[in-house]
Amino acid sequence: MELFYRPGEAVLGDVIPFYDAGEFKPFYLKNTRGHAGPDCEEGWHRLSTKDHLHFTEFPAHIRGGTGSVLKVGELYHMFYCTFEDNPRRQFIRHATSRDLERWETADEVLPADGKIYDPAEWRDPFVFWNEGEQKWWMLIATAVLGKTERRACVGLCVSDDLRRWAYREPFYAPMAAAGACECPDLFRMGEWYYLVFSNYCDRFQTLYRMSRSLRGPWLAPERDTLDSRAYYAAKTGTDGSRRYIYGWNPTKELPKKTFNPGNRISRDCCSWDWGGNLVVHELLQNPDGTLRVVPEAHVDAALQTRRPVDVTPVLGGCEASPHAVRLRADCGFGGVLLDRVPALCKLEGEVRFKPGTRRFGIALQVDEQYDTGYYLYLEPGRNRLEYVSGIRFGGRTARAARCSPMRWSWSARLRWRPTVSTRSRSLCRIRCWWSTSAARSR
């Protein structure tokens, strides 16, 4: 069982969701980072799972970048991209299969037209059937030709037969960022269409836009992200009843840019790498049409064995019972240490606080001196949830990340259910679940 799948001696990159014959069969881009072992084939690979916990992996023997997979009749179609340098150019490719295992690459190659779209930014095709137009539409991560570097857009091509494509004006062109709107994805839920894409120049995360028509306008909601920063290249898929979003959580393993202070034991201030661990959420629609992510049901239910927890007071006043801890720190910091958590677990609890409380929360990877650690703070007075590390207080771990503001109700109880997995080698992050090393928690 793996909460956040990662292939052995490799990393998981962009995921191409697909559901077929009662199973989730997402494809993904595999990068071995130079590993030369027996399982060292890079490129497209296919996973098979029924619960997003147990995975079987199969190589697709296709080398190229992100795309999409669809089934028409008894034939599977794969659209992907390839790359050339000197000069830099990118191309859309096409392959077909009858069993998802043996793929035949087609002869046709689709380059950018060089009139509307930049040949150097032309990748990540997403193909779907437009019922209203009675044509196949292809969305492409690209950039329009122009005078500035802020040319990122989602391009559009149309076809009658999935082989001959005509260029159209951009599907979505905000002209707000450099690079491209990577890994575009489109789906409909209720009365709304949703366009999902990622951008590494703007917050390095997955964004979405919403519209009641495929012709737009595409609206950016107040909170236009799915998950948080560094949840990247996420695309969606459905089993016919629920919609899921598949993205990757990056590592910080490669010797690239680093801003870590000297002699620090963490990699918190290193640059994000390309690829890491798979993270799957379920997507739900709010009454106003906006989206939110929640834990996938099988993943959330995977850890149900309860165990008692011992409490060790450290600072402040503490009253402990078998089922509750009351902590009081009127003029300073108070804390207790709980048991060392298992390598794979879910922490679930209920926190009650009084009006006037400035800050409270939990911490992971702390020692008895509270010198190291990662702190999830809830600050009612600032309407903020914040995730920081011990370096702010003179400790040895570097600052991590900050979450978005949140709404509060003083009369409400706060429930928190983070999931902890040390089998994941990815960066410690906070979302509905997170992955980290074995730790004591506060």
Question: What is each stretch, according to the model?
Answer:
Residues G395-R423:
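Short, aromatic/His-centered strand-loop micro-motif at the edge of beta-sheets
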Residues E23, P322-A324, L344-E348, S421-R423:
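Intrinsic-disorder/low-complexity, polar/charged segments enriched in Ser/Thr/Lys/Arg/Asp/Glu/Gln
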Residues E222-R223, F333-R340, W410-W416:
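Beta-strand-rich interaction surfaces with strong enrichment in secreted/lumenal proteins
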Residues G132, S321, V341-C345, K354-G356, ...:
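Solvent-exposed loop and beta-edge segments used for protein-protein assembly and interaction
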Residues M1-D124, F128-G179, R188-S228, S241-R242, ...:
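Beta-rich carbohydrate-recognition and catalytic domains
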Residues V325-R396:
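Secretory/extracellular carbohydrate-interaction modules
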